[in-house]
Each structure stands twice: as structure tokens, then as C-alpha cells.
Curated annotation (Swiss-Prot):
Keywords for the protein's UniProt record, in alphabetical order: Ribonucleoprotein, Ribosomal protein, RNA-binding, rRNA-binding
A single GO molecular function term of this UniProt record: small ribosomal subunit rRNA binding
Species, as recorded: Geobacter metallireducens (strain ATCC 53774 / DSM 7210 / GS-15)
Known function: Binds directly to 16S ribosomal RNA.
One Gene Ontology cellular component annotation held by this UniProt entry: cytosol
InterPro entries attached to this UniProt entry: Ribosomal_bS20 (IPR002583), Ribosomal_bS20_sf (IPR036510)
Taxonomic placement: Bacteria, Pseudomonadati, Thermodesulfobacteriota, Desulfuromonadia, Geobacterales
PANTHER family: 30S RIBOSOMAL PROTEIN S20, SMALL RIBOSOMAL SUBUNIT PROTEIN BS20C
Entry protein name: Small ribosomal subunit protein bS20
Superkingdom of the source species: Bacteria
Family: Belongs to the bacterial ribosomal protein bS20 family.
Length: 87
């Protein structure tokens, strides 16, 4: 256990950030899952709608540093390609 006051503060800050990041990452996975489920159901309209909802969430997570910018770009690219297969 940390003995310095500053180290104790960092532990508290890290816990707060961990909970916040976990919440955002979980929401991110939900949005991605919604797009994939719509594609599996072969519902083009719902898939496009889900994709339009997912892209800003993915980009915001990258901006906040929760996921890497390249990972965000890769997710958007793959989801877009997946939705475009429906036509």
C-alpha cells in the first residue's frame, strides 16, 4: 500500500478513471453489437441507423483516450464495410 499522500491520491484517481472508462467501453461494445446484430438480421435500414449511432460513440472514445485512434478507425471501417455488404 502507498505511504505518500500523493500516491494515495493517484490510487483514488485511477479507480475513478477505471470505472468511467469501463462504463464507456461497455457502452461502446453495445453499440458495435447492435450494428452486428442488425447486419445478421439482414435489416439494412436498421444496420445503417445503428452504424450512424455507433460512429460518434467510437470517435468520442478515441478522443477521450479510452481506445486508440487506430482501433477506433479500424472499428468504423470494418462496421461500415459490414453494413455495405447489405447493399
Amino acid at each position: 500500500m502507498a505511504h505518500h499522500k500523493s500516491a494515495l491520491k493517484r490510487i483514488k484517481q485511477n479507480k475513478r478513471k477505471q470505472f468511467r472508462n469501463k462504463s464507456i467501453r461497455s457502452g461502446l461494445r453495445t453499440f458495435i453489437k447492435n450494428v452486428r446484430e442488425a447486419v445478421e438480421a439482414k435489416d439494412a435500414a436498421k444496420a445503417k441507423e445503428a452504424l450512424q449511432a455507433a460512429i460518434p460513440v467510437i470517435d468520442k472514445a478515441a478522443t477521450k483516450g479510452i481506445i486508440h485512434a487506430n482501433a477506433a478507425s479500424r472499428n468504423v471501417s470494418r462496421l461500415t464495410k459490414l453494413v455495405n455488404t447489405l447493399g
